[in-house]
From Swiss-Prot:
Keyword Coiled coil attributed: no
Domain of life: Bacteria
Pfam families referenced in this protein's UniProt entry, alphabetically: RuvX
Source organism of the structure: Lachnoclostridium phytofermentans (strain ATCC 700394 / DSM 18823 / ISDg) (Clostridium phytofermentans)
Subcellular location: Cytoplasm
Record keywords, A-Z: Cytoplasm, Hydrolase, Nuclease, Ribosome biogenesis
Name of the protein: Putative pre-16S rRNA nuclease
Record-level GO cellular component terms: cytosol
GO MF annotations, alphabetized: nuclease activity
Cleaved signal peptide residues: none
Task of the protein: Could be a nuclease involved in processing of the 5'-end of pre-16S rRNA.
UniProt-listed SUPFAM superfamilies: Ribonuclease H-like
Matching Gene3D superfamilies: YqgF/RNase H-like domain (3.30.420.140)
GO biological process: rRNA 5'-end processing
Length: 150
């Protein structure tokens, strides 16, 4: 079983999947949305990926403001999380994604990636950063629990 990471945006949804050991995140695709208000096709594609990769949990980027408040984008992510829960029956974790897209752009700029290619992969890379942060959190939590039991 694996964990899916999503970077939800008004035009695209970046998708990443963990390995079966839940140690690393790999970007798998960017879902192009037809309209910000229509989710049916987006949710259908996510469901296909859930089945294909045997996903048991979803981590959704939660774009809080830099001062830790909840803005319009975060509210839209909360709504999308609820749609995901209802449609898939899976647990959905909202994960602080502040600066993940900025970090993705920095990585792509450092690699001298063309603008066209950058636009194709930035959301997928942001989803990788979101999921990898969550996987690292789980790994560290597990290590702390092992230490506590000694």
């Amino acid at each position: 079983m694996r964990i899916m990471g999503l970077d939800y945006g008004s035009v695209t949804v970046g998708v990443a999947i963990s390995d079966s050991l839940k140690l690393t995140a790999q970007g798998i695709e960017v879902i192009r949305r037809k309209s910000e208000t229509k989710l049916r096709q987006t949710l259908a594609r996510i469901e296909e990926l859930i089945k294909e990769y045997e996903v048991e949990e979803i981590v959704l980027g939660y774009p809080k403001n830099m001062n830790n408040t909840i803005g319009e984008r975060a509210e839209k992510s909360e709504e999308f999380a609820e749609h995901l829960r209802r449609r898939t029956g899976l647990p959905v974790v909202l994960w602080d994604e502040r600066l993940t897209t900025v970090a993705a752009h920095q990585v792509l700029n450092a690699g001298e990636v063309s603008l066209k290619k950058k636009m194709e992969v930035v959301d997928k890379l942001a989803a990788v950063f979101i999921l990898q942060g969550y996987l690292d959190y789980l790994s560290n939590k597990k290590k702390l629990n092992l230490t506590d039991s000694l």
